[in-house]
Every structure is written in structure tokens, then in C-alpha cells.
């Protein structure tokens, strides 16, 4: 059989994530595929950079290349966007992801968030309870919704969505771990932090460009929760080039 070397080259600036996953795509077909010159996870790479070289049977490399690139481009896109937000935060506010991930790929996408410098929020519903507007609507008010959660499981940390400052007060009154601010202006977020006085962590759920993260950090909120880092990250352009017979 013909042997060859395949090289993955990135076409745009990125933060690398998922090279081990890409490697496994090739090794699922042939465990003897050899990897050389692999870049580190989390490394910034410039256009034209070689991410890794794969040596093995040409048929193996050609069969797996599409799947390998799909994973690598997707995960690198998430890590790159996350790094943009993390860098913009200057370490003054923690960038969180959400559970809004691709079905069956949550573990990998949350891994890419960590590589990019973000922090995973909840992986599953058993990690904590987020009391949202629908829960409050069904229970009647925030206090009753929280009471029902605690009656079911007193150990789980509780986070409550707050759409108004009155919601913030109600959540603080029942002693939840985190208040998630939803859709309030900067001054209202600042006021929520003031009212909290350390009794609960303040998280801000926002769809803002990364250049506005310093403004959120200035409010004193501990977290910014950004669904876009997994929902809106664009795959990073890469190519897979066969460069000739492997030695």
C-alpha cells in the first residue's frame, strides 16, 4: 500500500484545540499512524503554521482527513473565540460557558472552552440548578421556586435568573449561591453588585462583543456567561495536504 505524509496547515490566526481528537480519528483506522511536530493545545498559531504531520497509509489519511478536520476546526474555533473574551477580561471577570452546546459534543466543546481560558459552568443538570423565568412562572415567585428546589435536593447550588432589580432582591433574600443578571443595563448590574454585598456571586448573561467585557468587569460582577463561545464560534479554516511518500 502507498504510504504518505499529511500536513494540517491553518489559514487564519487561532488558538489550537482538539489535535488529540483529530489524531484519534486517524488512529481509529490505523493505530500505527505516526504524528510529528504537533503544536501544543492552547498555543496561538499564525496563518501558514503547520499544526501536525501524520505519517501512515495514504488510504487511511485520506479516509479520516474530513472527520479529523471537522473536529479540529470546530474545537479550535471555540478555543479561539473564548481566548478573545478571556483576554479582554484582563482576569477581572471570569468567562463562563453554558450548556448550549452541540448535541453529543458537549464534553469536547467544554474542553475547548477550558483550552481557550474560559471556565465551564454546568456540564449537566445534576451540577446545579438554574432557576429561570419559566420555573418562577410555574412556582409563582422566586422564593417558592427556590423552596421547591431545596425540598428536592438541599445540596445542589442554586442560581437564579434576575430580569429586574426586584428579582435580584428576591434571590438575595432566599440566600442563593449566584444571581444571574439577564438583560439589564450596566448601571443596573453595578447596583445589583452593590446590593449583593458579597452575599451571592453575580453573573451576567450577555451577548456582547469581547471589546465590551472590560465594561462588565468594571461593575464588580464575578462572572460573565457567554453562550456565543459555543453557539457562534466559527470553524477555523485549515487544509490537509499530502506531501509525498512517508519514510
Predicted regions and their residues:
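Acidic/glycine-rich phosphate/pyrophosphate-binding loops and surrounding catalytic core
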Residues: 1-174, 178, 187-195, 201-203, ...
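Short secondary-structure boundary segments
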Residues: 183, 206, 228-229
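Cytosolic regulatory modules rich in charged/polar residues
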Residues: 205-206, 224, 241
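Cys/His-rich Zn2+-binding cysteine-cluster or related metal-binding knuckle/ribbon modules and their
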Residues: 210
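Short, charged, intrinsically disordered terminal tails
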Residues: 228-247
Amino acid at each position: 500500500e502507498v504510504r504518505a505524509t499529511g500536513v494540517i496547515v491553518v489559514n487564519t490566526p487561532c488558538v489550537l484545540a482538539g489535535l488529540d481528537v483529530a489524531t484519534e480519528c486517524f488512529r481509529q483506522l490505523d493505530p500505527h499512524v505516526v504524528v510529528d511536530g504537533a503544536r501544543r493545545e492552547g498555543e496561538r498559531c499564525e496563518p501558514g503554521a503547520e499544526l501536525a504531520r501524520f505519517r501512515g497509509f495514504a488510504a487511511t489519511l485520506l479516509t479520516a482527513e474530513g472527520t479529523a478536520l471537522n473536529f479540529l476546526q470546530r474545537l479550535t474555533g471555540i478555543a479561539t473565540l473564548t481566548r478573545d473574551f478571556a483576554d479582554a477580561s484582563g482576569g477581572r471577570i471570569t468567562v463562563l460557558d453554558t450548556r448550549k452546546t452541540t448535541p453529543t459534543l458537549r464534553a469536547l466543546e467544554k474542553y475547548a472552552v477550558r483550552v481557550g481560558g474560559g471556565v465551564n459552568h454546568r456540564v449537566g443538570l445534576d451540577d446545579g440548578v438554574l432557576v429561570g423565568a419559566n420555573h418562577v412562572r410555574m412556582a409563582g415567585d422566586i422564593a417558592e421556586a427556590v423552596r421547591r428546589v431545596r425540598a428536592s435536593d438541599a445540596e445542589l447550588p442554586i442560581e437564579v435568573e434576575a430580569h429586574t432589580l426586584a428579582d435580584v432582591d428576591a434571590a438575595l433574600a432566599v440566600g442563593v449561591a449566584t444571581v444571574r443578571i439577564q438583560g439589564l443595563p450596566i448601571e443596573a448590574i453595578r447596583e445589583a453588585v452593590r446590593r449583593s454585598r458579597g452575599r451571592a456571586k453575580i453573573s451576567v448573561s450577555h451577548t456582547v462583543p469581547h471589546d465590551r467585557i472590560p465594561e462588565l468587569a468594571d461593575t464588580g460582577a464575578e462572572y460573565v456567561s457567554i453562550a456565543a463561545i459555543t453557539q457562534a464560534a466559527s470553524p477555523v479554516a485549515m487544509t490537509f495536504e499530502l506531501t509525498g511518500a512517508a519514510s
